[in-house]
């Protein structure tokens, strides 16, 4: 990234005078930290993003780095302790203005993460990576569902909290109702262009059930999680829908058919009412 590129992501920054350190050099430690954060949580090591994705990634890195750096940019360490750099006739920004700037930069990070994740999720090569498998670990739609969820924290923290509840829901869903094979088959259907309409429909149904579960348990932290009675009511329509797709039903019955098959009652006691 060049200094000019960096400046294009941060409006209203005064240009350096001759001999002054470039802005990109001032931000270097924070840029490296932000890049490591983005790589570790989203892109993964060794993956070369396409140009569209790379532009989003650069914007996120710059905004996150600048938000982290802002409180320190006008401070210098002197022999007598920390001092504020002279503004040379410019009025120093108030604490409130700086806080609004930092909040705006963090908002920009959160606004650009969802489209970046969707670009990644629609890339088969990235989906096969370990970080890709992490983001395919639930039926939530990338970061979009976390973005719409009521929250008071940053987007990634909100997503992780929702993901924990989603995994509890999915554990019961897999072990008691769907089985491992069908779960794996359906979880990628939201992003796989080769998924059948039936697979995409079931993925969407499970996604909505999962979000209802998360919404309830987010608002009532004392509620039992997982609540098996609640899960059954959420998953019952999914089980019924499976019956309409012969191909999916075959996969499901091969693993779960015997577990969910209800044997008719038979009286084994000999007597006048024996049948």
Regions from the PLM with identified roles:
Residues 1-58, 72-275:
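Conserved short "hinge" loops at termini or chain/domain junctions
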Residues 61:
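Catalytic-loop motifs flanking and including active-site residues across diverse enzymes
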């Amino acid at each position: 990234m060049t200094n000019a590129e960096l400046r294009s992501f941060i409006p209203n920054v005064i240009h350096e005078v001759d001999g002054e350190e470039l802005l990109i050099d001032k931000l270097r430690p924070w840029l490296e930290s932000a890049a490591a954060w983005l790589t570790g949580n989203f892109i993964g090591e060794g993956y070369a993003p396409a140009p569209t994705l790379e532009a989003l990634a650069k914007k996120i890195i710059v905004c996150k780095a600048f938000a982290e750096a802002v409180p320190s940019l006008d401070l210098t360490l002197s022999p007598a302790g920390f001092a504020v750099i002279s503004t040379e006739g410019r009025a120093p920004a108030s604490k409130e203005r700086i806080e609004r700037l930092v909040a705006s930069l963090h908002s920009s990070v959160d606004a650009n993460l969802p489209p970046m994740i969707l670009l990644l999720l629609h890339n088969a090569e990235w989906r096969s990576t370990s970080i890709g498998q992490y983001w395919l670990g639930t039926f939530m739609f990338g970061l979009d569902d976390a973005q719409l969820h009521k929250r008071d924290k940053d987007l990634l923290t909100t997503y992780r909290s929702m993901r924990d509840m989603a995994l509890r829901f999915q554990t019961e869903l897999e072990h008691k109702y769907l089985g491992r094979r069908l779960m794996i088959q359906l979880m990628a259907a939201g992003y796989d262009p080769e998924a059948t309409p039936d697979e995409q429909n079931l993925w969407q149904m499970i996604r909505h059930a999962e979000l209802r579960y998360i919404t309830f348990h987010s608002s009532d932290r004392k509620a039992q999680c997982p609540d098996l009675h609640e899960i059954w009511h959420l998953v019952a329509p999914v089980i019924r829908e499976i019956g309409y797709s012969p191909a999916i039903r075959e996969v499901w019955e091969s693993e779960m058919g015997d577990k969910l098959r209800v044997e008719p009652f038979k009286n084994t006691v000999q007597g006048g009412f024996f049948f």
